[in-house]
Amino acid sequence: MPLPPIEDERLSPELERSQTVFRGAIWNVKRETFRYNGDLLTRDFVSHSGAAAVLAINDREEVLLIKQYRHAIRSRNWEIPAGLLDIPGEKPRDCAARELLEEADLQAKVLDPLVTLHTSPGGSDEVVYIFLATELSAGNAKFIRSAEEADIEALFFPMKRVVKAVVEGRIRNQILVSAVLAAHALRIGSQIEHQ
């Protein structure tokens, strides 16, 4: 018997009730009651605008990482440039380009989709669109960073060193982990195909 396609399946269960039970500065919490497999279920989840992120790789196959404070985990975290889809009508690709410029003062001639992910599907509807940026150059504008972005460090690291840090558990930001492993897998696959 052949295996089914490996693909997430969208469903639209019968929704009995949906209400916003908390309004926050950045996201809200919704409570929804719905029917699934004959049962009436109630679930709370973070209602999120979504985000875009960018894995920037320079001509030396080095990956751009930024270090930024994240209060929820009380840590300065290595990440890739990312930001909320909070500008009405802004496309994920445009958001990724904006974040690369705002957080790292860089622009990319090539910005291709890399991977799309749900960050925590058991408790949030957030979707993150991750792009692969190449052919990098200095941006035309310098941004004044404030709050947690005020002391961002932006450095390029060899891809192999970043992959090693991921598998050793030294960096844990899931957007960075997903992006770097996807890019690494694509590069390995490309090398195998060309042998």
Give, region by region, the residue ranges found by the protein language model.
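Structured adenosyl-cofactor binding patch, chiefly the S-adenosyl-L-methionine
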Residues: 177-186
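Conserved Nudix-box catalytic region and its N-terminal flanking loop in Nudix hydrolases
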Residues: 10, 46-48, 52-98, 146-148
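Extreme N-terminal tail/first-helix region
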Residues: 1-23
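Unchanged
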Residues: 41, 50-53, 84-174, 194
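Acidic, metal-coordinating catalytic segment for phosphate/diphosphate chemistry
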Residues: 17-53, 58-60
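Short beta-strand micro-motifs in enzyme catalytic cores
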Residues: 28-32, 76, 127-129, 153
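Generic C-terminal helix-cap and adjacent flexible tail
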Residues: 185-195
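Short beta-strand-to-turn element immediately C-terminal to the catalytic PLP-Schiff-base lysine
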Residues: 57, 132-134, 183
